[in-house]
Amino acid sequence: MKLLVIVLSSLLLTSCAGGGLSNSSENSYVSGSGAAVYIKQSDRRDAPKFSGETLTTGDLTLNSNQVTVINVWASWCAPCRAEAPLLQEFSIQYPQVQFAGVLTRDNISSAKAFYENFKLTYPTFIDDSILVGFKGSLIPNAIPTTLIIDKQGKVAVRISGEATVATLKKMLEKVTADA
């Protein structure tokens, strides 16, 4: 009986933390808590090279010698919709930083509607197999997830869940100040 209570409590807490499981094709994804993890320079891992087809601009390769914000999103994700205006605003406020999205578990027509609705101007990669290169840096199944890659091409920050103005600003300033 005690075990049953523990299991049910765990399931309840998991489903309440940041949105729980969503429906339809995205049924194995959960929203993160929004917690940001700053990784000290000596512990950072290489990020994969970003190259591939984008939602609107065709093939693209990102500059690996520039601070880069990568946002993993889907049009059906409520926290993704909530943070999209913030990411767009920051992409304009920080012209020295590259911004890019990675679409996951979504269809192109819904993603394009999302992209147009939020007037996003930064590119979004449509092949989420690029995420395999982030093994160990991404929390499996957390959408949205935002990564900040430093100038050396290493993962410096992971935000699992909806990014806030304060968190994104603090983390961007920290990473851009890194030597």
Model-flagged regions — what are they?
Residues 65-67, 95-98, 122:
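Loop/turn elements at helix/coil->beta-strand transitions in domains of secreted/extracellular proteins
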Residues 1-49, 179:
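N-terminal targeting signals for export/organelle localization
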